[in-house]
Amino acid sequence: MTFFELVKALILGIVEGLTEFAPVSSTGHQILVDDMWLQTKYVLNSQESANTFKIVIQLGSIFAAAWIFRHRFLEVLHIEKTKTEGPRLNLLHIFIGLIPAGIMGLLFDDFIDKHLFSVPTVLIGLALGALLMIAADLFNKKVTHTTTVDEMTYKQALIIGVAQCLALWPGFSRSGSTISAGVLLKMNHKAASDFTFIMAVPIMFAASAKSLASNIQYIHSDQILFYIVGFIAAFIFGVLSIRLFLSLINRVKLMPFAIYRLILVAVIAVLYFGFGIGKGI
């Protein structure tokens, strides 16, 4: 691996860490930064290896979220004692939230991989996700009833879990769909975000681990450093991104992210349809 090749791994790891849990679609950013610009398939000598690299850096982001919420997971699993009295988020909330997307993923995973991973379909997901986020902010200007994740009901967990199914469409964004659903259910943005990230860790880890196991043969010994650099960058910037997002989301809400998504749609559309960059993805 040359220095400039490792810089590509660093850039993609940073992009993954910054975008995986923000409601801006990490898939859209990977198309823009990798498929249209850096093109790691040429660095790693195959599209399969490039796809495997994306799985590895996504795992870096997942570990970042797991680290941020480590005490919460330990509480839910009864490994660590709860520090406060009263209602608490429990394992059943998470399980209920995971059921809809888990079932849909098992049923349609192959179809999604074959038919929905293209630039036009991702652009549709980006745009529709942005519209949902705008609607969530516009139609929920009243006082929220659920101010912390510990106050949420099982019904809210189920509806948010159903909304997570929208994220099976590439580009829609898991956090965009679930935070929007939470806000429409009268949760404040921080509470909806907390549940989104906590719920995402187990299902994303399971999906990524399954994908990595199926593609492990595409990781070659002379490319290990490339994967390590990307993973570490995704983890570090994932931690920073999640902490910053959670500290700001109640103030800035979803609208700025929705506007950013629409700008991203325009940029990718111009490059793809106007200049033919990324054709064949």
Swiss-Prot record:
Membrane topology field: Multi-pass membrane protein
Location within or outside the cell: Cell membrane
Transmembrane segments: 49-69, 92-112, 116-136, 152-172, 196-216, 224-244, 257-277
Pfam families from the UniProt entry: BacA
Signal peptide: none
Reaction equation(s) it catalyzes: di-trans,octa-cis-undecaprenyl diphosphate + H2O = di-trans,octa-cis-undecaprenyl phosphate + phosphate + H(+)
InterPro entries to which the protein is assigned, alphabetical: UppP (IPR003824)
One of the protein's GO biological processes: peptidoglycan biosynthetic process
GO molecular function term, any single one: undecaprenyl-diphosphatase activity
Miscellaneous comment as given in the Swiss-Prot or TrEMBL entry: Bacitracin is thought to be involved in the inhibition of peptidoglycan synthesis by sequestering undecaprenyl diphosphate, thereby reducing the pool of lipid carrier available.
Record's protein name: Undecaprenyl-diphosphatase
Gene: uppP
